[in-house]
A protein has these predicted regions:
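A short, conserved structural fragment
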Residues: 67-76, 80-81, 164-174, 245-252, ...
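Short, cationic-aromatic polyanion-contact patches
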Residues: 83-89, 175-194, 257-269
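Short, amphipathic alpha-helical interaction segments positioned at domain boundaries
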Residues: 93-108, 185-209, 271-274, 278-280, ...
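Positively charged, polyanion-binding regions of nucleic-acid-associated proteins
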Residues: 116-133, 202-218, 240
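Non-catalytic regulatory appendages
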Residues: 242-302
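Glycine-rich, small/acidic residue-mixed loop/short-helix segments
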Residues: 301, 306-377
Length: 377
């Protein structure tokens, strides 16, 4: 078994069988999304985006799923934003909020944010949003200031994160390029209609998170799961214990990995053998990198620093990160700029350029995507 090609298969990067952003996010459990534009591409490349044969999701389609509330965005698992389903946001918050709050404690102390401040902040937000409306961060900050709450420095970041962790607010639809917030209860009710959200806690929640993780990201280790889930190793082991009967274990280089019993059948609709694409342009914070604490299956040690531990947008050739990329707009045209860490063959460069064109079709901006190379090796 090739670890990285199998991960690509179960994540839908190879032989994409998903067609709906919400179905993909549900399969993955959560998708890291602090860089919104990059996170949308991460969803898109798993939905056949930009296929030269036509079809596949576009950037606008992922936007539409987000704006409709089919997928939500909040701080969950770790102290950063993730895409998550309305049906899952409640139990995932209950599971992960206590540890994220622990991360916030020293910052609250430094910024003078105490329990009274948090209670008042939540009360203001609840009153402002209780009619089912949507407000931008700037609009909420204005209301907090009117209530004599200091939003300066980075205080506003932590006041909003607290409201998210409390299960009070989550993402609303974008207003132009601005993000809005809504009451989580209203957003979930509108999205689910009469359907019930999952009601999980304790080991049942740990087990469900483990199930989502290992089926959609295996082969992976229990340490990988602990990292991704923002939990202790003990919690990760408890979650794995709940679902290990549904998984298979194998040892590679002395390390135990867990994955779906049939890695090709584990992904809905999949019958595609795991294989490596010639090239990929992975977004920043992609789940093929950020989903694991050990990234050596895709990231050569020599490139760890230059790629920011694989978290920068990555150029991947035959399953290995060989460079980074960025999107810039020059005279109204999208340009994909490459920085390669090693020489690549003409065949590989052609595959990279093909991926850049695919990205352009995903954006659907009707502009030419050019590839410039700034080699640093």
């Amino acid at each position: 078994m090739n670890i990285i090609s199998t991960r690509m298969a179960v994540q839908g990067v190879v032989g994409a069988s998903f067609h709906d952003p919400a179905v993909l996010v549900g399969w993955m459990g959560c998708v890291q999304a602090q860089d919104f534009a990059m996170a949308k591409w991460g969803v898109g490349l798993r939905l056949g985006a930009g296929s030269s044969r036509g079809g596949g999701v576009t950037d606008a389609a992922v936007d539409a799923a987000f704006n409709s509330g089919a997928i939500l965005r909040t701080h969950v698992l770790r102290p950063t934003w993730h895409f998550v389903l309305p049906a899952d946001i409640g139990w995932m918050l209950r599971l992960s909020a206590p540890r994220i709050r622990g991360f916030c404690v020293p910052y609250h102390r430094q910024l003078g944010i105490d329990a009274a401040v948090l209670r008042k902040s939540r009360k203001v937000m609840l009153a402002a949003l209780q009619d089912g409306g949507f407000l931008t961060r700037v609009e909420i900050a204005s209301l907090l200031k009117r209530a004599k709450l200091d939003t300066g420095d980075i205080r506003m970041n932590f006041l909003m994160m607290d409201a998210e962790l409390e299960g009070l607010v989550c993402s609303g639809p974008r207003r132009g390029k601005q993000f809005t917030y809504a009451l989580l209860a209203s957003r979930v009710a509108a999205s689910l209609g009469g359907s019930a959200s999952l009601d999980l806690s304790g080991d049942a929640a740990l087990g469900e998170l483990a199930r989502r993780y290992f089926l959609s990201r295996g082969p992976a280790t229990v340490n990988d799961f602990a990292w991704w889930g923002g939990m202790t190793l003990g919690q990760a082991k408890r979650g794995l214990e709940v679902v290990k009967g549904e998984l298979t274990a194998a040892v590679f280089d002395g390390v135990e990995y867990w994955f779906g019993t049939d890695v090709n059948a584990a992904r809905p609709g999949s019958g595609v053998a795991a294989s490596l694409p010639a090239a990929l342009l992975l977004p920043a914070y992609d789940e093929l990198t950020v989903g694991y604490t050990d990234r050596s299956a895709i990231l050569p040690p020599a490139f760890e620093k230059a790629s920011f531990s694989g978290l920068k947008p990555a150029v991947v050739v035959n399953g290995r990160i060989v460079g980074i990329w960025r999107r810039v707009v020059v005279k109204g045209k999208v340009v994909v700029e490459l920085t390669l860490f090693e020489k690549v063959s003409k065949t590989a460069m052609a595959a990279i350029e093909k991926e850049a064109r695919r990205y352009g079709r995903f954006l659907a901006e009707g502009v030419e995507v050019r590839v410039t190379t700034g080699r640093h090796y």
